[in-house]
From Swiss-Prot:
Its main location: membrane. Gene3D superfamilies: Nucleic acid-binding proteins. GO terms for cellular component: plasma membrane. Residues 1-8 are cytoplasmic. It holds the Pfam family CcmE. Heme chaperone required for the biogenesis of c-type cytochromes. Transiently binds heme delivered by CcmC and transfers the heme to apo-cytochromes in a process facilitated by CcmF and CcmH. Residues 30-155 are periplasmic. One of its GO terms (biological process) is cytochrome complex assembly. The lineage of its organism: Bacteria, Pseudomonadati, Pseudomonadota, Gammaproteobacteria, Pseudomonadales. Keywords: Cell inner membrane, Cell membrane, Cytochrome c-type biogenesis, Heme, Iron, Membrane, Metal-binding, Signal-anchor, Transmembrane, Transmembrane helix. The gene is ccmE. Signal peptide: none annotated. This is Cytochrome c-type biogenesis protein CcmE. Heme binds at residues 124, 128. GO terms for molecular function: heme binding; metal ion binding.
Length: 155
């Protein structure tokens, strides 16, 4: 092989190796930031991987909120109308967090099936519901019940 071809081959191989390394790094970074959404039914059925960071959403069950008097810890139940999962959160709950409202919690499922949340997101007005929560409630038939019971909903 003549020197010019050898040099071109080396350059092409170096470029391919660089592109391959860049793609591998990008995929690795994206994989670490993926938070899959699970409904309470899926978590209760054991579909959510234990210890993996997930998003879970549904309606906060009325009467389920318990706050620790000595810390910022809060425990509450989230339902999709079919199943319920207990969520434990250490921190200040959002101002719009209420029982009977839709939320999305980010965290990890422990061995007991409880979601240990490190972030809780509440809907930002009475008409908005996160798309994942809305779809989960629609599948379970609870969306109409929620809309009929909320302020401004059909009575």
């Amino acid at each position: 092989m003549n020197p010019v071809r050898k040099r071109r081959l080396f350059i092409v191989l170096a470029i391919l190796a660089g592109v391959g390394a860049a793609v591998a790094l990008a995929l690795s970074a994206l994989q670490q930031n993926i938070n899959l959404f699970y409904t309470p039914s899926q978590i209760a059925a054991g579909e959510a991987p234990e210890g993996a960071r997930i998003r879970a959403g549904g309606l906060v069950e009325k009467g389920s909120l318990q706050r620790d008097a000595t810390s910022l810890a809060a425990t509450f139940r989230v339902t999709d109308g079919v199943a319920t999962v207990t969520v434990r959160y250490q921190g200040i709950l959002p101002d719009l967090f209420r029982e009977g409202q839709g939320i999305v919690a980010l965290g990890r499922v422990d061995a007991g099936g409880m979601l240990q949340a490190d972030e809780v997101l509440a809907k930002h007005d009475e008409n908005y519901m996160p798309p994942e929560v809305s779809q989960a409630l629609e599948k379970s038939g609870m969306l109409k019940h929620y809309e009929n019971g909320k302020p401004g909903g059909a009575q």
